[in-house]
């Protein structure tokens, strides 16, 4: 949607928050 920081990092490339994905900065965001 808009880029929303999920307050989660994803050093292993996995986001545990529903709907969140790992971006190239290793931060989980929601579309």
Curated annotation (Swiss-Prot):
This is Kalata-B8. Keywords: Disulfide bond, Knottin, Plant defense. This is a cyclic peptide. The presence of a 'disulfide through disulfide knot' structurally defines this protein as a knottin. Probably participates in a plant defense mechanism. Inhibits the cytopathic effects of the human immunodeficiency virus. Has no hemolytic activity. It comes from the Eukaryota. There is a cross-link at residues 1-31 (Cyclopeptide (Gly-Asp)). Belongs to the cyclotide family. Bracelet subfamily. InterPro entries: Cyclotide, Cyclotide_sf. Disulfide bonds join 6-20, 10-22, 15-28. GO terms for biological process: defense response.
């Amino acid at each position: 949607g808009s880029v929303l920081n999920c307050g989660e990092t994803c050093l292993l490339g996995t986001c545990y928050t529903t709907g969140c994905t790992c971006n190239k900065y290793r931060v989980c965001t929601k579309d």
